[in-house]
A protein has these predicted regions:
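Mature catalytic core of soluble alpha/beta enzymes
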Residues: 1-240
């Protein structure tokens, strides 16, 4: 988590827990905190203040960790490692929609993983073919509450304390590294389409991405061009 804090210039911050609690996303007691409350909590959101000494984690007073942004990706990667160590050559696991594959399907073909349509949760807007990769999505439609006819989702920008308003509604990361895919699906969502595309261009050897903007445009990185099928009727752009 600390590595991704550095790599994303603080966009991924595992010390976001006080803000998440203020919004009720950790307690399910949902509410909209006022700006003064968030201003008082933001100084506690700074992963650079966390230090490691072997297996000991040192936190300043008031700083609390929320590893939800990488936990499922980390877990699925470790499960696949255990499978491989025990002679399993083909498998797929889904943890709350976080999909990780081991090898190919038993018949030798690639796994086909669908990506949920934010506008119609009963359908998919894309299908990607993968082997030995994770497919992990972060979306504004996954966890949210409504107050006074305004929707507030759970992907909080650690720089502002508010739900990210980046122009993206869904980000899917495809990578051999489930932990990376989990962390970056959140991070690129917060960055928004332009900065997310620039980040991918700097790290295209590590992952690919499928992103949907608020207006329904689908952005697909060029590494997926030959193994991604877009089924939505919206505009499609290839990021290269």
């Amino acid at each position: 988590a600390l590595e991704y804090f550095q790599e994303t210039d603080g966009v991924f911050d595992c010390t976001i827990e006080p803000i998440m609690e203020a919004w009720g996303f950790t307690t399910h007691d949902y509410r909209v905190p006022d700006s003064s409350e968030l201003s008082g909590l933001l100084p506690l959101v700074d992963a650079s203040a966390v230090s490691l000494n072997g297996d000991q984690v040192n936190l300043p007073s008031g700083v609390r960790l929320d590893l939800g942004g990488i936990a499922k990706g980390f877990t699925s990667s470790r499960v696949m490692d255990i499978f491989a160590q025990n002679g399993v050559t083909s498998g797929i696991i889904s943890l709350g929609g976080n999909v990780q594959t081991l090898g190919r399907k038993p018949d030798g073909s690639l796994w086909r993983v669908g990506i949920q349509d934010p506008g119609d949760l009963n359908s998919m807007f894309a299908v990607v073919k993968v082997a030995d990769e994770a497919v992990i999505t972060s979306g504004a439609y996954q966890r949210y509450f409504e107050q006074d006819e305004v929707r507030y989702h759970h992907i909080i920008d650690p720089r502002t304390g508010y739900p990210a308003d980046s122009g993206l509604t869904s980000v899917t990361i495809i990578s051999p590294d489930g932990t990376l895919a989990d962390a970056l699906s959140t991070s690129l969502f917060i960055m928004g389409p332009e900065k997310a595309a620039a980040f991918w261009q700097q790290h295209k050897d590590k992952f690919d991405a499928i992103m949907m903007t608020d207006d329904g445009t689908v952005l697909v990185t060029s590494g997926l061009a030959d193994r991604c099928q877009i089924t939505s009727s919206g505009k499609v752009e290839v990021v290269s």
